[in-house]
Amino acid sequence: MYDIGEVILETKNVSKHFPASGGRTLIANNDINLKLYKGKTLGLVGESGCGKSTLMRMLISLDEPTSGQILFKGEDISKLKGEEKRLNRQYIQMVFQDPTSSFNPKMKIRDIICEPLMNFGRIKPSEKD
C-alpha cells in the first residue's frame, strides 16, 4: 500500500448550521470529512453558496462548527479559546476569495507575506529584507 504521508489537518463529521427565518435551520456544511496531508495540496471546488468559505472559516477558527471535530496534528482545535486560538493561527491561514479586498494595495508583497510571520515571532523585522 502506498503511504501518502502524515495527516496534518482533518475534519471529522464537521457541520455548520445557521438559524434562519421562521424557526428554520440553514445547513451550510453537513458531516464534512476530509484529510489534508503534509506537503500535499488539496483543491476545494463547488458552486457559489455551497459552503466552501464556511468550511474554510471553521478551519482557520473564525467560526466554530455546530458539531464535529477539526484536528490539527491530531489535536482538536475546534473549541480553542483566547490565547490558544490566537497562537494556533500562526499555523493555519488563508487568502480569501477576493485577494484585492484582503490585501492593502499600498503594501509591498514582501510586507504582506512577512506581517503574520513577524506577528507570531517567526521572523524579526530586520529579517524581512
Locations of the language-model features?
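ABC transporter nucleotide-binding domains
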Residues: M1-D129
